[in-house]
Amino acid sequence: MSAFTPASEVLLRHSDDFESARVLFAGDLQDDLPARLDTAASRAHTQQFHHWQVLNRQMGDNVRFSLVAEAADVADCDTLIYYWPKNKPEAQFQLMNLLSLLPVGIDIFVVGENRSGVRSAEQMLAEYAPLNKIDSARRCGLYHGRLEKQPTFDAEAFWGEYALDNLTIKTLPGVFSRDGLDVGSQLLLSTLEPHTKGKVLDVGCGAGVLAAVLASHSPKVRLTLCDVSAPAVEASRATLAANGFAGDVFASNVFSEVNGRFDMIISNPPFHDGLQTSLEAAQALIRGAVRHLNSGGELRIVANAFLPYPQVLDETFGFHEVIAQTGRFKVYRTIMTRQAKK
């Protein structure tokens, strides 16, 4: 990761401000500026496992991946650089968490693309750290303020839930389909047969809805769930627990932390990373599935109909079929056979 995002390029216009600062980087860390910016000391906290992977190679223990930051993660920092995400409740969770730990008087810089809604940072932090806009470039805004009052933070207050048939789905800010079942997942679920058996892996599990519905009508299924997002991992664990289902849930960048083979891999793969369109995760899912499927095992994914996945499926497995579709979505199915490229 070498190219800087527009938000980082705006920060670099103010690099002199950070040379003697002890900086905590947090939020939507899309590049490795936290490892490369000239500071007195740098730490980073992220809820995204793939961002942690990149930064950990350069920052070691000075970057931490978790749902909630702790006091040790912000120790000795006198400056917060926060990259605004596209999701306002996610920003609220992260900023209230961080500012409840950081000392009064620290410098706060909030940066983000205008289309992300970064201007709402002013209203969100008005009670705790009044912000002023100090730069505008690359279609981004940069805001600065000082912490005048620590907020109280209760992670439990951010939990939500919704009912799906007889199931309870637990959610957190930043989790895909936080407010209800999305149309793509609904289409994929319509193709899953009752009494499915064997080992099933849900990649990009979100709130755990695919796995929970599958377990509800296939009690003998053995579930493994993974996601890059710490909120998604915790939400999936909570969803399984709320409905009395067992499953192994952990953070993974597609297959990076996955061991073993499965009888079925299911996914509603993301095609955005933050605000940016990215097909990398879905392509890595398709190409990597051959190393994690048993012979005769099945990959079943749902995707927007316009995305170019049929070619990757055919290149990797030798064939694919569309087993359900609407005007917007298609469910693709393929099987692990001898012609698959291992």
Swiss-Prot record:
Location in or out of the cell: Cytoplasm
Protein name in UniProt: Ribosomal RNA small subunit methyltransferase C
Organism: Klebsiella pneumoniae (strain 342)
UniProt entry keywords in alphabetical sequence: Cytoplasm, Methyltransferase, rRNA processing, S-adenosyl-L-methionine, Transferase
EC numbers: 2.1.1.172
GO cellular component: cytoplasm
Oligomer status and interactors: Monomer.
Family matches, as PANTHER family: RIBOSOMAL RNA SMALL SUBUNIT METHYLTRANSFERASE C
Reactions that this protein is recorded to catalyse: guanosine(1207) in 16S rRNA + S-adenosyl-L-methionine = N(2)-methylguanosine(1207) in 16S rRNA + S-adenosyl-L-homocysteine + H(+)
